[in-house]
Curated annotation (Swiss-Prot):
GO-annotated cellular components: cytoplasm; ribonucleoprotein complex; ribosome
Gene that specifies this protein: rpmJ
Protein name (Swiss-Prot/TrEMBL): Large ribosomal subunit protein bL36
Family named by the database record: Belongs to the bacterial ribosomal protein bL36 family.
Organism whose genome encodes this protein: Frankia alni (strain DSM 45986 / CECT 9034 / ACN14a)
InterPro entries noted in UniProt: Ribosomal_bL36, Ribosomal_bL36_sp
GO MF terms held by the record: structural constituent of ribosome
Lineage top rank: taxon: Bacteria
UniProt keyword annotations, A-Z: Ribonucleoprotein, Ribosomal protein
Signal peptide range in chain numbering: none
GO terms under biological process: translation
Length: 37
């Protein structure tokens, strides 16, 4: 999980979602997991 000020999709399988008011990227590739904060 990377925590970044701005999250972006890295590949086609990445999905940007909102969970509990936080913007997150989830993906099949676990290296692409990101959270805004």
């Amino acid at each position: 999980m990377k925590v970044k000020p701005s999250v972006k999709k890295i590949c086609d399988k990445c999905k940007v979602i909102r969970r509990h008011g936080r913007v997150m990227v989830i993906c099949d590739n676990l290296r692409h997991k990101q959270r805004q904060g």
